């Protein structure tokens, strides 16, 4: 029943998104009584590009889901990625910043040409993990490193993301650059929030609230009524996995 309902919907939705994208692009290229600000134009052009990408993705027999991890140094993005993958596919290190360039992890069953051009220019790593056949995992540069180019690299990749996991930890869950990018992109893609290293969370934040409650309070003030917030212990799970007792359900 589900397949018979979803397939006609996808066939209808894809051309509708393509038409909407073309209409928006034509409107942007036309004349306007009042000139558009650079910020408004950039946002609308980004929306038109998103519509085009989504229309093309829905035309595929099996659309790919791009899951992007975003966060600062030392929050455990690479470790979390390994935990989500159910095996070691990303290199985690104590050297910081660990992630200097975007790394795209895709299943061996996916032909590289199916990847978005923005992803094809990143470092590509093939995996054979069950359950990742239609999922692309992207580990992005650390936002709060001294390399300002990291932000630009992330900005080039964000339009490709279907889901962004905003990863933080007890010490670092509301960094300025990450929060600004989140506010800019929140209307255009799905965000979920991860507080990693939760096993170390034993003290309140400077506001007197626990980190998860402090983050939820900030999200509520920005208009999020029911944000997805996950509290994880990725390293603990990876360690258990190494001895054969790990389960993603306990992540």
Task: State what each model feature region is.
Residues 148-171, 181-190:
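Inter-motif core of Ras-like GTPase G domains
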């Amino acid at each position: 029943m589900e397949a018979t309902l979803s397939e006609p919907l996808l066939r209808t939705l894809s051309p509708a998104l393509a038409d909407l994208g073309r209409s928006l692009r034509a409107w942007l290229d036309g004349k306007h009584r009042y000139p558009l600000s650079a910020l408004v134009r950039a946002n609308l052009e980004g929306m038109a590009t998103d519509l085009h990408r989504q229309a093309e993705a829905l035309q595929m027999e099996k659309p790919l889901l791009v899951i992007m991890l975003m966060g600062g140094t030392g929050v455990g993005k690479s470790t979390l990625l390994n935990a989500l993958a159910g095996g070691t596919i990303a290199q985690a290190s104590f050297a910081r910043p660990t992630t200097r360039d975007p790394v795209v992890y895709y299943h061996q069953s996916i032909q590289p040409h199916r990847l978005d051009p923005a992803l094809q220019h990143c470092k590509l790593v093939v995996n054979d993990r069950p359950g990742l056949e239609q999922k692309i995992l992207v580990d992005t540069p650390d936002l709060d490193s001294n390399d300002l180019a990291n932000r630009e690299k992330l900005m080039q990749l964000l339009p490709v993301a279907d889901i962004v996991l905003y990863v933080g930890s007890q010490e670092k869950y509301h960094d300025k650059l990450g929060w600004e990018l989140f506010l800019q992109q929140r209307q255009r893609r799905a965000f979920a929030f991860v507080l990693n290293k939760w096993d170390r969370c034993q003290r309140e934040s400077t506001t007197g609230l626990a980190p998860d409650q402090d983050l939820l309070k900030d999200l509520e003030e920005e208009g999020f009524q029911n944000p997805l917030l996950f509290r994880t212990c990725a390293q603990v799970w990876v360690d258990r996995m190494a001895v054969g007792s790990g389960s993603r359900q306990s992540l």
